[in-house]
Structure formats: C-alpha cells, structure tokens
UniProtKB/Swiss-Prot annotation:
It comes from Human cytomegalovirus (strain Merlin). Keywords: Capsid protein, Host nucleus, Virion. InterPro entries: HV_small_capsid. Participates in the assembly of the infectious particles by decorating the outer surface of the capsid shell and thus forming a layer between the capsid and the tegument. Complexes composed of the capsid protein VP5 and UL48A assemble together in the host cytoplasm and are translocated to the nucleus, where they accumulate and participate in capsid assembly. GO terms for cellular component: host cell nucleus; viral capsid. Belongs to the herpesviridae small capsomere-interacting protein family. Coiled coil: none annotated. This is Small capsomere-interacting protein. It is found in: Virion; Host nucleus. Its main location: virion.
Amino acid sequence: MSNTAPGPTVANKRDEKHRHVVNVVLELPTEISEATHPVLATMLSKYTRMSSLFNDKCAFKLDLLRMIAVSRTRR
C-alpha cells in the first residue's frame, strides 16, 4: 500500500477557486455559477486564474457587467 495520503486533485482546487470567485468576489447566487452563458463561463475562468488580485471586488463586478453588456449589443 502507498503511504501517501489522498489530497485534493487539481480539479477540486479549481472548483474551489471557482466557487470562491462566484460567492465571495462577485457575490452571485450559486445557481448562476452553473449557468452555461458563454461570457460568464469565460470571465469566471479568467477571474479564477487572477485570484491574487481580488483587492477591489467592485472592479471584477463591473468588468463582468461590462462584458455581458458588450456581448448583448454586438448581436
């Protein structure tokens, strides 16, 4: 048997960061994080990678709103 203790996988860490961005940084309901809107999926992925820059939560909220607005006006 192996002596290594099972640790969190990369996918679990990524999911944990994703939930942190949705719930703490953007203050969105959990249901929204499961949405399949392409802009939301793209921006959440971007924000998850930028986890060290969460000093100004309002900037992330405004950026997300701006990106959603831009995506709707281009149609």
